[in-house]
């Protein structure tokens, strides 16, 4: 049985999942977390579903083996590729990023026209389209924005080049007259100002990061796994461990855009292996 004192494990293909980590830290400030960025293999968007599944489950195995009390798949592509496998494989609760965002979008839309943007792999998986299928009177327009992740990973989140790219990607959503847009990749919140500019103020952006953090809070509360309040004698100050399967220094530089100086001393992970 998991302990409330155990950490929450979070992973992504790179730094994008730090938007989820940031939201979890904001909403659950007492929780210990371990974050793994799979920069040695990511981004996952261009990979095949079997490749993504293999990389994601290897990291999941590692985190669960280290005793995390919950596993957060902070990557839309990985959520689409391996959620069912992960929930069958692990005894700890597994939280993903797709359904929380879908619920918020359905509750937010006024005209029933909802847009989704994500990596090519996420859009091709139809994970969002399938998740919206149960919602009545909704019309979904899904668009792949494959180059967005590359810009974010390089730290380029503004300027004419990326704005022009965004306008081209988002034009089908404007034609569809969506009033709600799901940012279906955890990298995309760093482009939210630019995306809002391209879409206009009448379109509401839904961040999977914020909604996923709310789902983590719900799951931990439901299972009596919330970390004790700081006044509780069992409690200790929250520890935040960040690891990368690639270059830890490069990860640290990029991660500063998400969490500022909170990310330091990133540890390289050499023991995550793909069978």
Curated annotation (Swiss-Prot):
Query: Which family is annotated?
Result: Belongs to the aspartate/glutamate racemases family.
PANTHER family assigned: GLUTAMATE RACEMASE
Q: Which NCBIfam families match?
A: glut_race (TIGR00067)
What is this protein for, i.e. what is its function? Provides the (R)-glutamate required for cell wall biosynthesis.
Q: Which organism is it from?
A: Mycobacterium avium (strain 104)
**Know the name of this protein?**
Glutamate racemase
**Pathway(s):** Cell wall biogenesis; peptidoglycan biosynthesis
GO terms classed as biological process: cell wall organization; peptidoglycan biosynthetic process; regulation of cell shape
Q: Where, by residue number, does substrate bind?
A: 12-13, 44-45, 76-77, 186-187
Q: Which UniProt keywords apply?
A: Cell shape, Cell wall biogenesis/degradation, Isomerase, Peptidoglycan synthesis
What's a single GO MF annotation on this record? glutamate racemase activity
Q: Catalyses which reaction?
A: L-glutamate = D-glutamate
Tell me the active site.
75, 185
Q: What is its EC number?
A: 5.1.1.3
What HAMAP family does the entry give? Glu_racemase (MF_00258)
């Amino acid at each position: 049985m998991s302990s409330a004192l155990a950490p929450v494990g979070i992973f992504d293909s790179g730094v994008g999942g730090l938007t989820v980590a940031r939201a979890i830290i904001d909403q659950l400030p007492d929780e210990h977390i371990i974050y793994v960025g799979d920069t040695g293999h990511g981004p996952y968007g261009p990979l095949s579903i079997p490749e993504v599944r293999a990389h994601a489950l290897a990291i999941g195995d590692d985190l669960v083996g280290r005793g995390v009390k919950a596993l957060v798949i902070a990557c839309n592509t990985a959520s689409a590729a391996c959620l069912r496998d992960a929930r069958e494989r692990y005894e700890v609760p597994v939280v993903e990023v797709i359904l929380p965002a879908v619920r918020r979008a359905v509750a937010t839309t006024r005209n029933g026209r909802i847009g989704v943007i994500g990596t090519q792999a996420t859009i091709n998986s139809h994970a969002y389209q399938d998740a919206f299928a149960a919602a009545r009177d909704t019309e979904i327009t899904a668009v792949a924005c494959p180059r967005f992740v590359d810009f974010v990973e390089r730290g380029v989140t503004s300027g004419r080049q990326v704005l022009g790219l965004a306008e081209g990607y988002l034009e089908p959503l404007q034609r569809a007259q969506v009033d709600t847009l799901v940012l279906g990749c955890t990298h995309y919140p760093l482009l939210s100002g630019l995306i809002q500019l391209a879409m206009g103020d009448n379109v509401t952006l839904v961040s999977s990061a914020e909604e996923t953090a709310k789902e983590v809070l719900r799951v931990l509360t439901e299972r009596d796994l919330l970390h004790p309040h700081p006044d509780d004698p069992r409690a200790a100050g929250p520890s935040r461990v960040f690891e990368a399967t690639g270059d830890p220094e490069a990860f640290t530089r990029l991660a500063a855009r998400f969490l500022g100086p909170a990310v330091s001393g990133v540890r390289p992970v050499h023991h995550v292996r793909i069978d």
